[in-house]
């Protein structure tokens, strides 16, 4: 028997709203217009709750594993996998010899438009399985789309994509559309006034 750590919609929304206030602090706006979130990724208690919130909509889809790409997204993805009671699978930026033969794809980073690579050991997953893709941050969805394409190479079905923080540009299209995030950050940030952060709309939908 496994305890399933699910929160009510109201509790999940209240928790995310409280953290929106934390993330909106002007001191979190870094040079280059980046938002500092590393401390949240280092707090097990906070990540455990956020992982349970993100896992909630995907219990019915019954993924076989959670997929993320190294490195910053690993703690959040691990907590989502823990809440779902499934394995965490980590794609690599660089192939490691000790992993054996791998599948490698090229993908375009949404934030910088750079060509990057992503690899996964052939023995890590099996054809016919179902994956939930999780990452800590996305801007245009380039890395997320890379993970979706990587799963296609393995004949694995992607049942969803969950991201902790999503930064949106007004009117800008995503490279990958089907993303469920927890926090939405406006692309316009001010070092004096802070970032505009609010819960993702799906959290505000009544059960």
Walk through the language-model features, giving the residues of each.
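Short glycine-rich phosphate-binding loop at a beta-alpha junction
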Residues: 63-70
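Gly/Ser/Thr-rich loops at beta-strand to alpha-helix junctions
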Residues: 70-75, 140
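Short, hinge-like loop/turn segments at secondary-structure boundaries
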Residues: 84-85, 105-110, 177-180, 198
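Short, glycine/charge-rich flexible loops or terminal/linker lids adjacent to PRPP-binding catalytic cores
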Residues: 86-132
């Amino acid at each position: 028997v496994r305890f399933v750590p699910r929160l009510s919609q109201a509790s999940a929304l209240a928790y995310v709203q409280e953290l929106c206030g934390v993330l909106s602090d002007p001191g979190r706006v870094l040079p280059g217009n980046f938002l500092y979130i590393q401390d949240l990724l280092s707090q097990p208690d906070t990540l455990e709750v956020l992982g349970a919130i993100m896992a909630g909509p995907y219990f019915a889809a019954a993924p076989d594993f959670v997929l993320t790409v190294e490195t910053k997204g690993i703690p959040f993805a691990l907590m989502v996998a823990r809440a779902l009671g499934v394995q965490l699978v980590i794609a690599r930026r660089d192939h490691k010899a000790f992993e054996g033969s791998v599948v490698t794809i090229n993908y375009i980073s949404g934030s910088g438009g750079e060509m990057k690579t992503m690899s996964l050991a052939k023995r890590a997953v099996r054809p016919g399985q179902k994956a939930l893709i999780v990452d800590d941050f996305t801007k245009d969805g380039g890395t997320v789309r890379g993970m979706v394409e990587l799963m296609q190479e393995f004949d694995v079905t992607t049942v969803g994509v969950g991201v902790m923080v999503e930064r949106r540009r007004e009117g800008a299209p995503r490279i990958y559309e089907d993303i469920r995030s927890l926090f939405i950050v406006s692309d316009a940030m001010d070092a004096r006034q802070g970032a505009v952060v609010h819960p993702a709309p799906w959290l505000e939908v009544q059960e």
